[in-house]
UniProtKB/Swiss-Prot annotation:
Belongs to the CbeA/YafW/YfjZ antitoxin family. Gene3D superfamilies: PAS domain (3.30.450.20). Induction: Expressed in mid-log phase at considerably lower levels than antitoxin relB. The gene is yafW. The keyword Transmembrane does not apply. The keyword Repressor does not apply. Disruption phenotype: Single deletion has no effect on expression of cognate toxin ykfI i.e. the probable operon is not autoregulatory. Deletion of 3 type IV antitoxin genes (cbeA, yafW, yfjZ) has no effect on cell growth. Keywords: Toxin-antitoxin system. GO terms for biological process: positive regulation of cytoskeleton organization. This is Antitoxin YafW. Pfam families: CbeA_antitoxin.
Amino acid sequence: MSNPTRGLQREITLRLGARLVQEGNRLHYLADRASITGKFSDIECRKLDETFPHFILQMESMLTTGELSPHHAHCVTLYHNDLTCEADTLGSCGYVYIAIYPTQR
């Protein structure tokens, strides 16, 4: 049985995809709702560990301001520490779908 791909579907072979649970303006990461496509190097894994909380804070702020809305699909793109995070609620009223990958230059 193959593992399902989680998060936003992108044509990028190295990415972390996840479905975050939204509770008000807070986001919760559940490991069983995430998947990795490709293989991150040790350095990329450290960057991801360092950067992930920053992306969560930015997305929570966007939920507060309405830039990310649980009622309307709208993709936002965030950049930090040579990583890109795309996020969208897809109008799901309870989830934020993400894809995080190395920034393409």
